[in-house]
Structures are given as C-alpha cells and as structure tokens.
Amino acid sequence: MNLLQEALAKIQPVDAVMLAKAQAKLDKKTKPLGSLGRLEEFARRFVAITGDLQPDTAKKIVFTFAGDHGVVEEGVSAFPKEVTPQMVFNFLRGGAGVNVLARHTGAEVRVVDVGVDFDFEPTPGLIIDKVAKGTRNFAKGPAMSREEAIAAIEVGIGLANRAKAEGVAMLGTGEMGIGNTTPSSAIIAAISGKTVKEVTHRGTGINDAALSHKIRVIEQGLAVNKPDPRDPLDVLAKVGGLEIAAIAGLVLGAAANRQPVVIDGFISTAGALIASELNPHVKEYIFAAHESVEIGHRFMLDRIGAEPILDLKLRLGEGTGAALAMGLIEAGVKILKEMATFEEAGVAEGEY
C-alpha cells in the first residue's frame, strides 16, 4: 500500500466513550452545566480525538503549504505569481500575518514548498518537497495528473506522520499560492453541484469585471475537464492545486494518527473537503478555525459538517485563522485540566 492507502485504512471514528468521560469531568467543574459553551465542546472533542483525558497541548505547528497555479495566466488574481516565492521568504523571516499570530498563540510555523515555480536554496524553516513547479492551466486541461495529486497528498501525510513522531499535540493548515481561490471555487462547485457564481468571490480583492472573468474561467475549466464529483481525486487533479492536495494529505494523516487538525480558511477547507470526501470519518478530527469572507466557504463547511470557531471577516489565508483558533482550543482543554471541581473548591453544587 502507498501512504495514501495506509492513511485511509487507519482512519477510525473518534472515541465516543472518551467524549462522554470528558463531558462528565467538565460537569464537575465549578460552573453551571454547559456554561463555558464551545470551550467545553473543544475540550471534549480533543479528548475524543486523542483518547487522553489529560491531553497535552504544548506543541502546536501550523504548516503553510506553498504552490503556484497555471490558471493565473488567465488573469484571475490581482497579484502576479512572483508574489508566491516572495511571501515564502517573508514567512521564513517571520514577518507575515501567520508568523505574528502563531507567536501570539505559541505555535510554530513550518513552510512547505510543494509546488512553487521557484528554486529555493536550503533554508532553515523551509521544507522543500516539490512535486512540480506549479500546476498547469486548468482552463485548458487538467491542472495535474492523478499521480501528481496523490504525490502532493502524500507530502502532507508524511508531514503529519513526522509531527506525530515528534509529539506534536495539534496541527494547523495554511497556504500561499497566488490564484488559489480559483481552484478552491472550482473544487466546491464540482463536488457540490453549486453554480460557479454561487461559490466564487474576490480572492485578493479583484473588481467586478475581474470577478466576472474569474467566474467564466472556472466555468470553462469545469467544462473542459469534466471532473467526476464522485471521485475526489479526479476533482483535485483536474481543477485543484498542489498546496490544496498537500493540505488534504495533512488532514488525512492527522485523522489516521488521531491528532486534532485546525483548518484555516477557504483554500485550506478545499483541502479538508477533499480529505473528508475520501473518508467521511475525517470530519471528526477537524476543527474549522473560522468562516471566511469568501462566499464558497460556507458551502464547504456545511458539506464537511464543521462549525467555524471564529467569524472575524478574515480572508488572508496563510494559516492566520488556524493560529488564532488554536489558542481557543487550547483554552478549552486547559479548562478541563486545570479548573477546580466543586469538591476540590468546597463549593456547593447546583440542583438540576
């Protein structure tokens, strides 16, 4: 079996018994039942995922995957593709939004070149695992071969496996790739059957005329490639991206290893959607960091069955929302681990 087949075979439902045990433990804390709302949800889900009533949350990593997109030559983005490697250098210097927010929540950022059209020198903090120098223009033909899509997925699975071996408690997804809202919209349109117009927004801030053009390009790509909605690998290969594939792999690897994975915004959720279409139990391991301004994001979240943690009108990507949400998930787990019980505090319990 290859890495993908192994990961898919290992994914099991989360532990319902541990979920109930976590809730019982939370109910003994010095508070009215359920009064910490979603923080309690985060704690019990974390326990059910890991199988540990005293889970560790110390080591958190946001993997920011970078890749270029051939469809950019159609003029679908406000920025040129040269910005992708420029932003990779910004990540490595610690100057990007994800770096700032990860420092704030105590997470590490690891940058992964899975498909940038640029030759990086070996650099501390950069993982070079390039499958190709970007995708091909899916307005004219498939973005990738099926083999390339699987290879990029396996980059993500491999990173999840290494993170598990390192004792990482929580994984986060992020991305960088000029033009990558275009394949993300194509993926949700192909899988859901929604019209391209319903799921396509402004990405980096394009104007009305450019948005109409972007919609036409995606419609053309879907017509040319005819991705099979029943085959997520076919959708990914024909209209997806290398970084989206690697995110799908990281999510699959996390689920196979019983690790919580926090997905960022629209592009990250495209990867998570591919993963959950490959194995429906994947959704039980996902924490959705936030709901993006991108209109297609809600359709993705609904199909996965994930309720976003934050709604801050974010649309940057990189892993910014994932880094922020990690802090709230960790707060919920700390309530479970550190808050006193009624008995410990000598406080009378309520009668329900």
Curated annotation (Swiss-Prot):
Q: Kindly state which reaction or reactions the protein catalyses.
A: 5,6-dimethylbenzimidazole + nicotinate beta-D-ribonucleotide = alpha-ribazole 5'-phosphate + nicotinate + H(+)
A molecular function (GO) held by this record is:
nicotinate-nucleotide-dimethylbenzimidazole phosphoribosyltransferase activity
> What sections of the sequence does the record tag as coiled-coil?
none
Q: Does the keyword Transferase apply?
A: yes
- This entry's Enzyme Commission designation comes to 2.4.2.21
The cross-references to Pfam families, in alphabetical order and at most eight, read: DBI_PRT
Name the keywords, alphabetized: Cobalamin biosynthesis, Glycosyltransferase, Transferase
Superkingdom to which the source organism belongs? Bacteria
Cited InterPro entries = Nict_dMeBzImd_PRibTrfase, Nict_dMeBzImd_PRibTrfase_bact, Nict_dMeBzImd_PRibTrfase_N, Nict_dMeBzImd_PRibTrfase_sf
Q: Please name the catalytic residues of this protein.
A: E318 (proton acceptor)
* Alphabetized Gene3D superfamilies for the sequence: 1.10.1610.10, 3.40.50.10210
Its Gene Ontology biological processes? Answer: cobalamin biosynthetic process
What pathway is this protein said to act in by its record?
Nucleoside biosynthesis; alpha-ribazole biosynthesis; alpha-ribazole from 5,6-dimethylbenzimidazole: step 1/2
Entry's family note: Belongs to the CobT family.
Tell me the PANTHER family matching this sequence. Answer: NICOTINATE-NUCLEOTIDE--DIMETHYLBENZIMIDAZOLE PHOSPHORIBOSYLTRANSFERASE
Q: Quote the function comment for this protein.
A: Catalyzes the synthesis of alpha-ribazole-5'-phosphate from nicotinate mononucleotide (NAMN) and 5,6-dimethylbenzimidazole (DMB).
Return the HAMAP family for the record. CobT
Identification of the protein by name: Nicotinate-nucleotide--dimethylbenzimidazole phosphoribosyltransferase
Q: Which organism is it from?
A: Geotalea uraniireducens (strain Rf4)
Designated gene of the protein: cobT
